[in-house]
Amino acid sequence: MTTTITITRPDDWHLHLRDGAALSAVLPDSARRFGRAIVMPNLRPPVTTTALAYAYRERIMQAMPAGSGFEPLMTLYLTDNTSAEEIDRAKASGIVHGVKLYPAGATTNSDSGVTNIGHCVKALEAMEKHGIPLLVHAEVTDVDVDVFDRERVFIERNMVPLLERFQGLRVVFEHITTKDAANFVAGAPENVAATITAHHLLMNRNAMFNGGIRPHHYCLPVLKREEHRLALVAAATSGNPKFFLGTDSAPHAKSAKEAACGCAGMYTAHAGIELYTEVFDAAGSLDRLEAFASFHGPDFYRLPRNTDKITLEKTAWEVPASLPFAGDELVPLRAGSHISWRLKD
């Protein structure tokens, strides 16, 4: 008899949907699995204003599969010049649910990011007043800091002073990758939470070098040592409401990944909930999947939980070698290999 599990429809609290033809290619994967998603603002040009967020949301809605109830939750891209008035407009809009902090140069399309947190004081004060979460890509970008230490150094250098200065600011430590981050969030006040990706739960840094360079396993923050992966699994399966699902699914064309200077990011939306189910199954914690995937996120964001359900069955299926993507190809995680859980229609 096939093993099945039925849970409240999950949400994705960290998603890259891109734009144009790329948006149309990837949106159906997320819309099939999730009720809502926090949509990242790192387009070219970035979504820096509420007006741009409205326009981007409209493009997403126009690309939505027929009959889908998926809801995009918009975000703004924080810059050195973001004003308190813009945060006021974001709050009044009802469509903006967070503001993303990218240290300049930290990841894809982050060139417009924050150069010094001190430049953002007025915006952060307004966010604190309105209860709008700050979503932090928590890595320093100094060339003299080892890429595997960027997250740990950011905690010491930036996150601790930020939380001391803005004690009422609600903060999501995005895509945590280290035991340092897991421990920090677990011990932080209740206004601090974290998202965890499926790929950081499933793989350690060996996956980038297994038999050769594996460009489709390169992401930012980069995969870390096994001790860190185990700490993330422990956090995700702990039942602690500070930790919740955020895929950080980041589609890039195959030609942009398999290159001399390839892009960072893994595409996981094709199996956005199935991969997490694998993790929780392997950890003997399927009974805690629903809280992590469906409850902790909306509770932190002060939104209602979804009311409909999805069912997954323990039936292996083979992931396609590639998917069509805006005139190119997109290589999904586990391309040509199997995933042990399947979402039932």
UniProtKB/Swiss-Prot annotation:
Belongs to the metallo-dependent hydrolases superfamily. DHOase family. Class II DHOase subfamily. This is Dihydroorotase. One of its GO terms (biological process) is 'de novo' pyrimidine nucleobase biosynthetic process. Binds 2 Zn(2+) ions per subunit. The active site is at residue 248. CDD domains: DHOase. Its cofactor is Zn(2+). One of its GO terms (cellular component) is cytosol. Pathway: Pyrimidine metabolism; UMP biosynthesis via de novo pathway; (S)-dihydroorotate from bicarbonate: step 3/3. Its EC number is 3.5.2.3.
